[in-house]
Amino acid sequence: MPVQLRFKTGLTGADYVTREAWREARLLHCPVHPRGGCGFARHGTYARKSPAGTLIARWYCPQGHRTFSLLPDHLAARFPGTLSEIERVVATVEQASSLEAAADALRSDPVTLASAVRWVRRRVVPVRGLLTVLVGLLPQFFLGCAPTICALCARLSCERVLMSSRELAQVHLQALSPPLGFGHPQYAGGERNPRLQQHMGTDPPPHPA
């Protein structure tokens, strides 16, 4: 599994694709061997299914046998799609009478309600955990705030709290769980990370540039 790192772009998904911003991504040295000598080099790109046309720049360390990728802020980590799309799902559940009602309202494809509920739950469960962690991790921003999308958006006076939180919690991203952070999937299923908590999502397989 590639190690994901933050690529601060300030771009929307459409702008990222239009500008081919992955070409602007830079990783000046190996995160594992900052002094060099490991053969660290750019290693093409891999594609994300959504938004269409999205490519992610990556690098490879031969000595460490590790691949590193720079994930732009608008994309969800180890989940398909964008942070905004996942945030919309969670916000819909917060406002709905039940998770089933939210899933029924959100489903657009001809899938069963049970499948839609599973799809929604896979997004809601990790994000609810993340929001609770963020409130405790960043008291300077969220002290006394309820761990909900609505409450955190109101506190930050923003429309997209997950993208904003990736900026605020940038020094913790390797410990925070997906879809916000880049935590290792070995802590999937709600197990406790030595630093925070991890949860595994899904990510498309890498493809050559």
Per-segment meaning from a language model:
Residues 1-11, 132-209:
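Long C-terminal interaction/binding lobes of large macromolecular proteins
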